[in-house]
Amino acid sequence: MNDETRDLAVLSRRAAMLGGLLAATTLPAGIQAGAAAQPIAPQDVIPLWPDVPPGGAQVTVAEEVVERPHPQGLRDRIVRGVRTPTLTPFLPRDQARAAMLVIPGGGYKHVVIDKEGYETAQWLAAHGVAAYVLRYRLPGDGWAAGPDAPLQDAQRALRIVRDRSERLGVGRQRTVVLGFSAGGRLAARLAT
């Protein structure tokens, strides 16, 4: 067992939370460089719920993807009015050493899908981690669960990621969560 494998094997919940916090403050520059050097495309999109998400019978929001200008020309999209929560997997070319649920931020007003989601996942996949980006429902969009709608999506997403991790041969012990901003708060709620 090499040092990297041993380090992944001994991650505890607290270490994973601290690592996620540190990564959230240090990854963006590395993500841009790593993603440009080895682009990895998502494999598919996985709907979290088989039909309408819980408490969504009366929800009327329309999903909108907004392209924001970026000073360095990078793609910077946000998603508002998420009606169909999804997971977008980015799998490494070789055997995955770990799996990570990536929860973008956006202040619970929108989901910052590119720089806090896809770019992070591309970087992780280029470094041997199976990354799954969560596009979650927003609490102000009229869901019956209100502020707990994003948590319902995160809980379901983590169950799906753990199941897929088992199939990839990674295992639950090497499945962690990384969240940015509001996604970080959501990740912390998952740990309780």
Over which residues does each language-model region extend?
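C-terminal segment of classical bacterial N-terminal signal peptides
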Residues: 26-33
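N-terminal cap/lid segment of alpha/beta-hydrolase-fold proteins
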Residues: 39-94
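Loop/turn elements at helix/coil->beta-strand transitions in domains of secreted/extracellular proteins
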Residues: 97-98, 129, 173-174
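Short beta-strand element of the alpha/beta-hydrolase
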Residues: 97-105
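Cap/lid segment of the alpha/beta-hydrolase catalytic domain
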Residues: 107-116, 133-152
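Short amphipathic alpha-helix adjacent to the substrate-entry channel of hydrolases
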Residues: 114-132
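Primarily recognizes the serine-hydrolase "nucleophile elbow" in alpha/beta-hydrolase
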Residues: 156-192
